[in-house]
Design a protein with these regions (language model features):
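Feature marking well-ordered beta-strand scaffolds used for ligand recognition
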Residues: 1-410
Length: 410
């Protein structure tokens, strides 16, 4: 598809459209990347389609669709991680409201581990690890011996933190697990229905610590220096008053800066829930993390159709940050945050002053003209995930669009 056929922007500031691919009308969600022999490969998951796509973006103005790998039936296959030639894809029971068969079990659950080292366009399945429950959601793998999972587990409510040894990717083995006391079924601290918490993931594992986004359970810091015995270091709650049912969706620590970036996920359309947020959290004392500053709420550009984004329809609020994860193929800037914001598109923030984060760029794609899935109720742009490669090219997905490839001009 030529760039002339790409959806245009409703509005943009300091961001240019470089390329686009409609992904054969498979609406994309999560993105992962590896570089092999000077070529850049994207691995994408999809909404309403079980499976994964492989795109060559070596020439970002001419993205090439290489392959689609079909996934198991009636199964969410939303999450992808790739590093050191190993691709890890999640397998999960689909929740109600997504247009499938929620009363039927998924065909598969847990994770698939694939070899993408020798033939990046054609993943070779090495193994299938199962949770014994409803599968995994948002996982973390940036190479090495261990994969860090947001995984269901018999005897617990919601996803917990489970660590796998994947040094032999054909035979992964669980090393340990961590859960909050409220998650133990039948325990004295078990929460009532509607108040239950879960480890949304991904766990960000670095420097002997795992930073866990625990939804309404807060930001949880875990000591994993002894990988066989994870222990809690601290916990910071923001709900109430802030955030949806996924009050902490993402936590990304910047250890050299002494802070972490955390955000909730907007869930209900037209902002029908507690205020969603993105925040800088001071972690200089890991035993006592504290809220440092809040990011500004995006404002509609001049001439926009509505006076605020809440009234536009669809979800409005933060969703996914660019996760560099220490991978050489990805941009590693520590003074810039890339954040998808559903109907407000992609937002870019300067955090060189952590006391005063400021927006410096945005890109709002035009609304889709064709519905590819059930959501959102109002057919508007819903920017979902973002990834930035070491060349500065920005990749953004949408529930009813294809893949936008962008470049920030500042």
């Amino acid at each position: 598809m030529s760039i002339s056929q790409a959806p245009r922007a409703i509005a943009s500031k300091n961001i240019d459209l470089i390329g686009y691919n409609d992904l054969k009308e498979r609406p994309a969600f999560k993105i992962a990347m590896q570089e092999v022999n000077g070529r850049f490969y994207l691995y994408l998951s999809h909404f309403w389609v079980s499976g994964w796509s492989v795109i060559d973006v070596t020439e970002p103005d001419k993205p090439e669709y290489l392959n689609f790998i079909e996934g198991p039936d009636n199964t969410w296959t939303l999450q992808v991680q790739v590093a050191e030639g190993i691709l890890i894809t999640s397998l999960e029971k689909i929740p109600p409201g997504w247009g499938t068969r929620p009363d039927d079990p998924p065909e598969a659950e847990g994770i698939y581990i694939w070899d993408v080292s020798t033939d990046p366009a054609t993943p070779k399945l090495l193994s299938h690890w199962e949770t014994g429950s409803d599968g995994t959601h948002r996982n973390f793998y940036n190479g090495g011996k261990y994969a860090h999972l947001s995984a269901c587990c018999p005897g617990y409510d919601g996803q917990i933190y489970r660590i796998l040894d994947v040094s032999d990717p054909s035979s992964p083995k669980e090393v340990s697990k961590f859960a909050l006391p409220e998650q133990k079924q039948g325990g004295k601290e078990e929460l009532e229905e509607g108040l239950r918490i879960f480890q949304h993931g991904p766990a960000h594992a670095e420097n002997g610590r795992a930073y866990l986004p625990y939804a309404r359970g807060g930001m949880v810091v875990v000591n994993i220096e002894d990988i066989n015995n994870p222990t809690i270091v601290s916990r910071l709650n923001v709900y109430p008053p802030l955030g949806s049912a996924i009050a902490v969706h993402t936590v990304y620590p910047y250890f050299s800066k002494g802070f972490a970036i955390a955000n909730s996920e907007a869930l209900k359309e037209k902002c029908d829930e507690p205020l969603n947020y993105t925040a800088i959290i001071d972690i200089s004392d890991e035993t006592n993390p504290r809220l440092k500053s809040l990011f500004p709420v995006p404002e509609p550009p001049k001439g926009y159709t509505h006076k605020n984004f809440c009234e536009r329809g669809g979800r409005f609020g933060p969703h996914n940050q660019h996760h560099a994860q220490g991978l050489d193929c990805l941009e590693q800037k520590e003074d810039r945050i890339y954040l998808t914001y559903f109907n407000a598109g992609l937002r870019i923030y300067d955090i060189s002053d952590p006391n005063l984060p400021r927006e410096i760029a945005y890109y709002i794609p035009s609304d889709p003209t064709k519905r590819l899935g059930l959501l959102p109720e109002t057919l508007v742009t819903q920017s979902e995930d973002v990834l930035v490669d070491r060349r500065g090219y920005i990749y953004v997905t949408d529930k009813n669009h294809g893949l936008h490839i962008l470049k920030c001009s500042i």
